[in-house]
Amino acid sequence: MKFKPLHDRVLIEVLDSSEKTAGGIIIPDTAQEKPQEGKVIAVGGGAKTEDGKLIPMDVKVGDKVLFGKWSGTEIKIDGKEYSIMKESDIMGISGK
């Protein structure tokens, strides 16, 4: 894949979240309030301050992250779906 996010944007592969309960009940998207989980595929170079200093990114390629269901913008690259968002939309880095 040839895609490089700019500034403080992050490209994330959204990992499948369970849409069924343990009893087999299907939960509609509108009722799922848990954050989404994804894997960081690419990161930008970081944002810049007003005086031009680079703010380094906290996430790196390979990190598993949590983010809100409605965060970012869905895009398709080479037939595969991803989400691109600002680093500030990411809630945190989950354990590996």
Swiss-Prot record:
GO MF term (any one): unfolded protein binding
Cytoplasm recorded as keyword: yes
SUPFAM superfamilies with a match to the protein in the record: GroES-like (SSF50129)
Keywords: Chaperone, Cytoplasm
GO biological process: chaperone cofactor-dependent protein refolding
Any one GO CC term of the record: cytoplasm
One matching Pfam family: Cpn10
Subcellular location(s) per record: Cytoplasm
Highest taxon listed in the record's lineage: Bacteria
Family: Belongs to the GroES chaperonin family.
Task of the protein: Together with the chaperonin GroEL, plays an essential role in assisting protein folding. The GroEL-GroES system forms a nano-cage that allows encapsulation of the non-native substrate proteins and provides a physical environment optimized to promote and accelerate protein folding. GroES binds to the apical surface of the GroEL ring, thereby capping the opening of the GroEL channel.
Assembly, per entry: Heptamer of 7 subunits arranged in a ring. Interacts with the chaperonin GroEL.
Alphabetized HAMAP family for the sequence: CH10 (MF_00580)
Name of the protein described by the UniProt record: Co-chaperonin GroES
